[in-house]
Regions:
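ATP-binding N-terminal substructure of ATP-dependent carboxylate-amine bond-forming enzymes
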Residues: 1-114, 123, 145, 328, ...
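Conserved ATP-binding module of the ATP-grasp superfamily
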Residues: 134-136, 160-163, 175-214, 218, ...
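ATP-dependent carboxylate/phosphate-activation module, predominantly the ATP-grasp catalytic core
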Residues: 205, 211-277, 281, 299-321, ...
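Short acidic-glycine loop/turn motifs at beta-strand connectors
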Residues: 225-230, 288-291, 350-351
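A glycine-rich beta-turn/hairpin centered on an aromatic-Pro dipeptide
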Residues: 333-370
Length: 440
């Protein structure tokens, strides 16, 4: 056997346990990233909505280990039998479980305390503040029955503010602006029915100087950490969010002055240190304010849409890097990769009032544009839309590349000129009902 063949066999023999969630990155993208690196061992729990339907596909793309209903000891035993060389999840709600399993299996991953900081917004903000990282003011929202704690919150909190779910919240789900303590109580009372807990954050004012008209004043820094060494791969720019805080568009590379870029990278690096992160791919959100940059949040996973944009702009394969890190490889970049074009991803959202889509027109014309590489209809006629879903409730997404930021601004205008979204509100059409009867 040749040395080359031996190397291929060594790579192919590696096994990565991936705790799967159907609302994370696609099976095809993950399998493609693993193709020359390792065999995937899909760890599945069919109590997670959408998982059972994916089992036939997962079985074609690796080994499936079903841990539904198993306790910790049985789960560890089932996974150990597969002899994994690494472990990974790309979903916040599975982060703490993955950390606990990694510790039992002696595999590299975030430790349990770091995983808690990634999935508990209050704990994360405490760690960032205590580490000297500039963050918005924040306050823990108590349970409704704790009258003394509510009096304290009323005395300490400032308004307007932003109310967010405290645990495992992704994509601006159920995130709202509140103007008073009464609005906070009302929202918490509604969420309490589902056992939801919340955190209240200072509403950060906008900084308009240094920001092109049409772009937002917040960015994200895409980083990796390998054995404690941080490499920063890109700064992702944003378009202004749809109400109340739903993402509408992202692009790599952000249009920033050199001074602002340095500030963003420094804030992201400080956040990584404050949380004690030693491994993984990270997504750090930063807002520029009149008083300087503030770290909004640090995610212990890859941001949605980032792998595609980073690849289109630089050629770097971020999902493959995440797998390599999980397998224990050392991956370090001396400097951020150079961008050749501007890569974008738009989430086109329904108006805040809309509850059911009745018509989407113009997608075929938009898809024919040479700047478009992918267009996906997420909510079609007859389907429900709900702003509470945050980013995930968008009507359609469109991704691709353009030559520069001027072309990006022009393309964003074209999307809204070309595509028409029609719908109804106030439950005029029940979810799954016939949109033809909307005007009846």
């Amino acid at each position: 056997m040749s040395a080359g063949a031996q190397a291929v066999d060594a790579v192919a023999s590696r096994r990565l346990a991936l705790l799967y969630h159907p609302h994370s990155f696609s099976v095809f993208a993950l399998a493609g990233a693993a193709r020359t690196l390792c065999e995937l061992v899909w760890i599945v729990d069919t109590t997670i909505d959408g998982t059972e339907a994916m089992l036939p596909m997962l079985e074609r793309m690796g080994t499936v280990v079903d841990v539904t209903g198993l306790d910790q000891e049985a789960t560890v035993a089932a996974m150990a039998a597969q002899r994994p060389d690494g472990i990974l999840t790309l979903k916040d709600s599975l982060m703490q479980r993955t950390a606990a399993l990694a510790e039992r299996l002696a595999l590299p991953f975030h430790d349990s305390e770091v995983a808690r900081r990634f999935t508990d917004k209050h704990l994360q903000r405490v760690a960032l503040r205590d580490g000297g990282v500039p963050v918005p003011g924040f306050w823990e929202v108590p349970e409704l029955a704790d009258a003394a704690a509510w009096e304290s919150l009323h005395a300490l909190a400032s308004f307007p503010a932003v109310l967010k779910p405290r645990y495992n919240s992704e994509g601006s789900r159920d995130t709202i602006r509140v103007e008073s303590i009464e609005q906070v109580r009302a929202a918490v009372g509604f969420g309490a029915e589902a056992g939801e807990r919340f955190v209240l954050e200072e509403y950060l004012g906008d900084r308009r100087d240094g920001v092109r008209a049409g772009f937002a004043d917040y960015v994200s820094v895409e980083s990796i950490v390998s054995n404690g060494e941080v490499s920063q791969l890109a700064v992702t720019g944003r378009f202004p969010p749809a109400e109340p805080f739903r993402e509408s568009g992202f692009f790599i590379d952000a249009e920033l002055s050199e001074a602002d870029r340095r500030r963003a990278l420094a804030a992201a690096r400080a956040a990584v240190a404050a949380l004690g992160v030693r491994i993984g791919a990270l997504h750090t959100e930063i807002k520029f304010t009149p008083d300087g940059p503030r770290v909004i949040e640090l995610n212990g996973r890859i941001g949605g849409g980032v792998p595609e944009m980073l690849h289109d702009a630089t050629g770097v394969e971020l999902l493959a890097i995440a797998l390599r890190l999980a397998l224990g490889e050392s991956v370090v970049f001396a400097a951020p990769p150079v961008t050749s074009r501007v890569a974008y991803l738009f989430y086109v959202q329904a108006p805040l009032w809309m509850t059911t889509v009745t018509r989407v027109d113009g997608l075929d014309r938009l898809a024919a544009d040479p700047a478009v590489s992918e267009l996906t209809l997420n909510r079609g006629p007859g389907q429900c839309v709900d702003w509470r879903e945050g980013n995930h409730g968008h009507v359609f997404s469109v991704g691709g590349t353009v030559a520069d930021h001027d072309a990006l601004i022009a393309f964003e205008r074209r999307i809204h000129d070309e595509v028409t979204i029609e719908g109804v509100g106030d439950d005029a059409v029940p979810c799954g009902g016939d949109p033809a009867h909307a005007a009846a």
